[in-house]
């Protein structure tokens, strides 16, 4: 299960899906409610929790809540962060001592002019994030963070051509687990084609990255938000396209159903929902013509905001 602690953040990513709540300075979920959600889902049998934001590391009670989760018996405790706070090794040590076993960092580019200048709008941000990764990897080498350190970049037009360099740069640091998330048109770029490539444009780039990984890098690599039928747009043989799509694009395999507790929109209690169901039923679209596809049951289509910009004509039953 995952707990969204609130939407406040120390970055200003232009494509942030939470930008409206972030900029409205909506309050954090009180720690007693976070603990209540941990109690509830522990009783339901959950032993894995992820803390999300906003930016969890600026939540004043994160260490307290991580320690509470460990005390209850959660064995996998993850924090999904933009990574900047981890440049402070003392904070990193405090987090793992509290009980964190995994950290995922949202670093979108290895180039300062893109990461700092175009995306997060924070000068010097990338250098802090890279220093933070090195700190986390050093702790992992000491036997901490048993569930790993990973990256969670958004793939957009500004980063599309730099993916190979991104993989090489961060694999050289020691990262072995990367999940690219195809941009969900949101925030200030919700309808901006300068940021949101079509699958037809993106898939040849993605295919080259997958082949690079197969032949040379051997990373634990996956792509979210890319329907498997999009692989046919990459210009590959059907057999190779099927192999790569099954290995790298199957969200049902690497993104199983998970419960989410989030700050309330109205009222005093956190909202609870299953993210995959909410995403499929409220945020994404499929064509009626998709029904014959052999992947129909495991595919949730494309973001509605993507369809508003690029349509649904790229979808085709496999």
Give the positions of each predicted feature.
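Canonical Radical SAM [4Fe-4S] cluster-binding loop centered on the CxxxCxxC motif
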Residues: 1-32
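A short acidic, helix-capping loop that chelates divalent metal ions and anchors anionic groups
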Residues: 22-24, 112-119, 187-192
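Flexible mid-to-C-terminal extensions adjoining Fe-S/redox cofactors in radical SAM and related proteins
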Residues: 235, 248-318
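Structural recognition of alpha->loop->beta junctions
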Residues: 92-108, 168-177, 243-273, 282
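Radical SAM/AdoMet-radical enzyme domain recognition
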Residues: 31-50, 59-183
């Amino acid at each position: 299960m995952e707990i969204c602690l609130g939407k406040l953040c120390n970055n200003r990513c232009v494509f942030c899906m939470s930008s409206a709540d972030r900029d409205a300075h909506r309050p954090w979920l009180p720690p007693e409610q976070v603990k209540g959600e941990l109690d509830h889902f522990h009783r339901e049998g959950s032993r894995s929790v992820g803390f999300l934001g906003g930016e969890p590391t600026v939540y004043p009670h994160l260490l307290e809540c991580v320690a509470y989760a460990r005390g209850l018996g959660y064995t996998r405790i993850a924090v999904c962060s933009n990574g900047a706070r981890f440049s402070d090794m003392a904070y990193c040590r405090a987090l793992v001592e509290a009980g964190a076993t995994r950290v995922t960092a949202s670093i979108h580019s290895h180039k300062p002019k893109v990461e700092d200048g175009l995306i997060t709008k924070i000068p010097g941000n990338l250098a802090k994030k890279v220093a933070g990764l090195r700190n986390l990897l050093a702790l992992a080498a000491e036997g901490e963070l048993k569930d790993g350190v990973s990256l969670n970049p958004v793939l957009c037009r500004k980063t599309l051509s730099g993916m190979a360099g991104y993989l090489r740069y961060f694999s050289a640091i020691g990262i072995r687990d990367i999940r690219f998330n195809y941009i969900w048109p949101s925030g200030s770029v919700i309808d901006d084609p300068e940021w949101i490539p079509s699958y037809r444009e993106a898939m040849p780039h993605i295919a080259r990255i997958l082949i690079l990984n197969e032949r040379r890098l051997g990373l634990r690599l996956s792509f979210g938000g890319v329907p498997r039928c999009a692989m046919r747009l990459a210009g590959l043989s059907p057999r190779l396209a099927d192999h790569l799509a099954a290995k790298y694009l199957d969200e049902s395999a690497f993104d199983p159903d998970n419960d989410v507790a989030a700050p309330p929109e109205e009222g005093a209690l956190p909202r609870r929902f299953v993210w995959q169901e909410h995403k499929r039923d409220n945020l994404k679209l499929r064509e009626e013509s998709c029904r014959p596809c052999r992947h129909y049951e495991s595919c949730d289509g494309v973001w509605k905001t993507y369809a508003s910009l690029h349509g649904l004509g790229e979808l085709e039953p496999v």
